[in-house]
Amino acid sequence: MQDHASSKDDRALQRTRHWISGYSPDVRIQERGVLVSVGDGVAWIKGLPSARMEELLDFEDGSLGMVFDLCEELVGAVILQQTGSLTAGQEVHRTRRPLGLLAHDSLLGRVIDPTGRPLDGQSPLHEGAWVNLNSPTPAIVERDFVHEPLYTGIRMIDAMIPIGRGQRQLIIGDEGLGRTSIALNAVLHQKDKDVRCIYVLIGQKRGAAVNVMQTLQRHGADAYTTLVVADAGSPPGLQYLAPFAGSALASHWMRQGRHVLMVYDDLSSHARSYRELSLLLRRPPGREAYPGDVFSVHARLLEQATCLSPEQGGGSLTALPIAETQQGEIAAYIPTNLISITDGQIYLERSLFAAGVRPAIDVGRSVSRIGGKAQHPAIKHEAIRMKLDYSRFLELEIFTRFGAKLDPGMQTVIKRGQLLRELLKQDRFERFSPEQELAWMIAYNEGLLDEHPLTDIPAALLQIQSRLDARLSLETPREDWTAALQKMLTTADV
């Protein structure tokens, strides 16, 4: 029995000696930092001399952070996920990887945070391509001219402030004037248009995110839309990263040849979160206490929006950033920055909103610098005449407020301008197809609606929507359109 046990021990000893003889030590040097202080979503760490900007950090309690500031003695990090109790003295380790997320078609219809974690109660994503949140912008040689229209379904925008695929169009105005409604209307109108949508909510109340998701579900738009949410209760670091997460996902799909519509709601909140982080990290403040590089941050974000050349797949990324003004002051720092970065702006005016004009868009102060090049020739031809009529009406309307007498020609301009204003009014989430858009524009320019009372205009528009001949298209000759509309509007019981 003892001999058997002894031989068994010898064999085990031989195996151990054989394993040791083939062992070669591998020296790994791992940096270890120490948490010095933490508070308000910002952590200061001592050590980690090789840490890089925007590198992820693992904290001892399981929390996740990102390097956001490098000093001689300390590393400043923003907290992205706080899973335990962060206290001074805990260890911090580098991950040697930047922040990113998994991009996959299964993200359509989902609600995620900027790190890719699900917020809708469904299972996390385990497949897809890894995309860096700080993805490079497309090079000049990879881009193409904006040449395709992106219809929003809003009559005033599609006619007078057209948007093209690959354009950056700012929506700006005071709170409560319908900025989100315009963006949502544009998203809802992309149904069956082979356009994917990403809606980023930054610093909004949690109820706002729920309302947006319910609106998308109610209209069947959640099937082609992804929500990226960093609400007001999220750490400022997540609020800062939210638009970059949406942009990285949109750029990935654009590189695959897809058309993507991106909504940033809103970049004023994003600028405030960046200001908060910068002040907490002791960066020198600039105008209105914003950091000096806030312009370049927004420029880097919005430069992702473009139309790729056919050699690069022909995809596009259209951006609709939203900005908030105070008392209609568009000369403030962030609004002027965004106006100078984007390709045009849709300006909402409180006086128009109070007068019952919906959407409350000030056509005179709104502009689309490149959208007209993508507008269909038929719609563009009608819009030129309409813009002239409307601008003349706005000039003459001022004199009517003082009781000035007008000659018959001016009275005609005023009457047709009032008619056009009624035609441009639109209920929330009411949408017009491009063919219906062309129909009412021709009807106005041909004077087919001049004899209708202003109170009957909504009914006339409803007749155009419901009775429009399906055989009519944007390529149909204008004479055929005019004949069909004359027959429709004269026989309709409006």
Swiss-Prot record:
Main EC class the enzyme belongs to: translocase
Classify the source by domain of life: Bacteria
Listed GO MF terms: ADP binding; ATP binding; proton-transporting ATP synthase activity, rotational mechanism
Q: How does it sit in the membrane?
A: Peripheral membrane protein
The similarity comment for this entry is: Belongs to the ATPase alpha/beta chains family.
CDD domains referenced in this protein's UniProt entry, alphabetically: ATP-synt_F1_alpha_N, F1-ATPase_alpha_CD
Q: Which UniProt keywords apply?
A: ATP synthesis, ATP-binding, Cell inner membrane, Cell membrane, CF(1), Hydrogen ion transport, Ion transport, Membrane, Nucleotide-binding, Translocase, Transport
What's the protein here called? ATP synthase subunit alpha 1
The record, for Gene3D superfamilies, names: 2.40.30.20, ATP synthase alpha/beta chain, C-terminal domain (1.20.150.20), P-loop containing nucleotide triphosphate hydrolases (3.40.50.300)
The compartments listed are: Cell inner membrane
Q: Which NCBIfam families match?
A: atpA, PRK13343.1
UniProt cross-references to InterPro entries, sorted A to Z: ATP_synth_asu-like_sf, ATP_synth_asu_C, ATP_synth_asu_C_sf, ATP_synth_F1_a_nt-bd_dom, ATP_synth_F1_asu, ATPase_a/bsu_AS, ATPase_F1/V1/A1_a/bsu_N, ATPase_F1/V1/A1_a/bsu_N_sf
Quaternary structure? F-type ATPases have 2 components, CF(1) - the catalytic core - and CF(0) - the membrane proton channel. CF(1) has five subunits: alpha(3), beta(3), gamma(1), delta(1), epsilon(1). CF(0) has three main subunits: a(1), b(2) and c(9-12). The alpha and beta chains form an alternating ring which encloses part of the gamma chain. CF(1) is attached to CF(0) by a central stalk formed by the gamma and epsilon chains, while a peripheral stalk is formed by the delta and b chains.
Please give the function described in this protein's UniProt entry: Produces ATP from ADP in the presence of a proton gradient across the membrane. The alpha chain is a regulatory subunit.
Q: EC number(s) of the enzyme?
A: 7.1.2.2
A Gene Ontology CC term for this entry? Answer: proton-transporting ATP synthase complex
| Catalysed reactions listed for this entry | ATP + H2O + 4 H(+)(in) = ADP + phosphate + 5 H(+)(out)
Residue numbers marked as site, Required for activity:
366
